[in-house]
Amino acid sequence: MADGKIKSGAQLAPNKTLDAALEAIVNSAAQPLSSLSVLAVKAGKTVYHKQFGAKWIDVTNPANNKPADAATMYRIASISKLVTTLGVMKLVETGKLNLDEDVSKYLGYTLRNPHFADTPITLRQMLSHTSSLRDDGGYYWEASLKLGLRDVLLPGGVGYGKGAMWARNAKPGVYFQYANLPWGVIGSVMESVTGERFDRLMRRLVLDPMALPGGFHPADLSDADLANVATLYRKRTEVNGKEVWNSSGPWIPQVDDHSKQRPAPRALPDYKISTNGTLFGPQGNCRLSAAGLAEIMLMLMNDGVHRGKVILKPATVAEMLREQWRHNGKGEKVAGGSNGDPNGEADFGSARRLMNAWGLGNQHFLDITGAGNGDRLVRAGGYRAYGHLGDAWGLKSAMVFNPFSRDGMIYLIGGHGVDPETTPGEYSGMYRHEEKILDALYTLAVNPAQ
């Protein structure tokens, strides 16, 4: 079972060596970070939990900066997909959803890739990024646009355009391409079968039963919880549509700066349930702390049990973590026999070979290594894991764990002072500072050999 409430750094044995290593990473001239929250689990117990930097920065008077702490929540970006999957699997358990059913049944209209009109699209495909949906036509439509997903996804719809959201070269179920759009469809499906708005449904199914503050809709957070949400930063502006980084310049807020006013609601009062599942960001809009992610990690390690309460059945967790796709090593071209693109172009750059195997809403890290490419998590190798990465608005994040050794690591980076593309990894497709964070956590806190 989990070791009770996640402990803050002050409640754990001191680890000054790791403190110093992470402090040096955060304050590095090569890649300064606005804030960092980390957590390490060893043999099923939290052994390290620490924060560095500021969750909110006053560029005119640093004395007013608000330091990140154990309660600080971040917009966790694509780790949200793993959280959303927990909600899907709860609905599968109750019989409201079937992973292999044609999702048209749930949506109320026929959803097909028009280039492969005879092939149904399923939740299993969408959760494993093999649905043939692509991000090229967009993946979020704000409420003011008054568009439903059917207006975007169906030929002839007012938002369909040139149909860039559909793959032309691979039918559903056969080719992996990391994408965000399927998660908007998943959100609509979840709303359709429950009659509940996605963000509130996720609170009922997952966050409230686990007593986790945060959620997918900041406008609904209490003032106290909202004050715990970190602002994400970059030292970057745009000039004529091009990024301009200035490492000696000020930290520029990117998202979640609520210092002057509360966030606006994402849905209009007349929102019709299930019409636009992208509104609340099932793919990336969840706010959680490192401690909150650790509760989820430990629940999955414990076969679905969280502090004595069954969140998911053991068989459900096993199915969620079971491998659904693995790259066949034949590059990324369908014509060359490839079964997927391991480069993760939608969110994670290109030519980085970062994605090599997938479960349902979770990545499988196979310890593949190369200079600036691969999914290796620690320099010495040998650590395979499940989990997810995140990358958006200056944040980079990771939640990775091995349920067999019961070890895991979490980091949430609140902002970058230098373009991460200038600091590629030495032995993986992650950036160099991400490698350093994970390697420090592993060697100085997690290493099972210690």
Predicted regions and their residues:
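Short, surface-exposed coil-to-beta transition loops
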Residues: 281, 393-397
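Short, surface-exposed loop or secondary-structure junction motifs
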Residues: 56, 114-379
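A short, polar/charged loop-to-alpha-helix boundary motif
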Residues: 56-68, 420-433
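Short, well-ordered beta-strand elements
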Residues: 396-402, 406-423
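Active-site SXXK
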Residues: 19-25, 38, 44, 75-100, ...
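Short, hydrophobic/aromatic-rich segments at coil-to-beta transitions
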Residues: 379-387
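Short, conserved catalytic-motif segment at the N-terminal edge
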Residues: 12-74, 165-166
